[in-house]
Structures are given as C-alpha cells and as structure tokens.
UniProtKB/Swiss-Prot annotation:
Active site: H20 (proton donor)
Residue runs in coiled coils: none
Taxon lineage: Bacteria, Pseudomonadati, Pseudomonadota, Gammaproteobacteria, Aeromonadales
Localization terms from the record: Cytoplasm
Signal peptide: none
Binding site for substrate: D28, H106, Y128, A129, N130
Family to which this protein belongs: Belongs to the RbsD / FucU family. RbsD subfamily.
Biological function: Catalyzes the interconversion of beta-pyran and beta-furan forms of D-ribose.
Catalytic activity: beta-D-ribopyranose = beta-D-ribofuranose
Pfam families associated with the record: RbsD_FucU
Cellular component GO terms held in the UniProt record: cytosol
A GO term for molecular function: D-ribose pyranase activity
Protein name: D-ribose pyranase
Length: 139
C-alpha cells in the first residue's frame, strides 16, 4: 500500500508524470470536459468531494508555480475565491516558492483547459470554482 498522503492511483500517477509548466485543471461538477485531456472524475454527489479537498490532496505532492482562475469567481463566488487564495498562499509558503495568480474570462478558461494533461472533476457546485494548476520545479 502506498504510504504517502495522496492515495488515489490516477491522481498519484498524474502528479508523478507532471513536468515543468504542465497543467492540471481542477473543476467543479459542471465544467464541460473536452475530448483530449485525461478525465479523472472524483465527483460522488453534489458537494462531495469539494474543490478544496481535491486541491489539498493534489498539493501534497505537486509543486505549483502558477494558478489560473476565471475572473468571474471574484464577483460571483467571493467566499470560495478567498478560500482558494488562502489555500494557495499556504501552499506557496510550504513549498518555499511563490505562486503567481492569473485570471481570465470563463470562456477563455474553458478553452485553456483543453491543453491540460488532465481535468480532475470534483463534486463542487459553487459557480466558477475551477482552477488550472501550472507545475513548477522541485529544485
């Protein structure tokens, strides 16, 4: 049995395969998932697992240099936006490297998600609760 924190086999393999600047989209239950990227569907029911839980699991093993979010989250879901910013800031401190935050319109976000290595679907049902993690380097 794997000893680390991240026990989900597809997520663990995904993180192990990430190279510098590779991207993972972590999304809510409603984001359309295009053909192309690997689809890792973790949604069990509305709200389970939530986006923050999925993000927490991924961040146990992933070095992140940039996060991209839809700008609409700031106005439509400000509490979730702030919680994600807090979680990203905590990870930045833990990894000892800054994490840039970028925003784009939701339609641009959906287009950008096509270049992700994988799209990880959570059970999150908060509007615009999606992000793209851009991998950094561990050295």
């Amino acid at each position: 049995m794997k000893r680390g924190v991240l026990l989900n086999a597809p997520l663990s393999a995904l993180v192990a395969q990430m190279g510098h600047t590779d991207e993972i989209t972590v999304c809510d239950a409603g984001l359309p998932i295009p053909a192309g990227p690997e689809r890792i569907d973790l949604a069990l029911m509305a709200g389970t697992p939530n986006l923050q839980t999925v993000l927490k699991a991924l961040l146990t093993d992933l070095v992140v240099e940039k996060v991209i979010m839809a700008s609409e989250i700031k106005l439509i879901s400000p509490d979730t936006h702030q919680a994600l910013l807090d979680q990203i800031e905590t990870h930045s401190l833990e990894q000892g490297k800054p994490i840039a935050i970028e925003y784009c319109l939701h339609e641009e976000f959906k287009t950008r998600s096509r270049q992700s290595k994988a799209i990880v679907r959570s059970g999150e049902i908060t509007p615009y609760a999606n992000l793209i993690l851009c991998a950094g380097v561990a050295f």
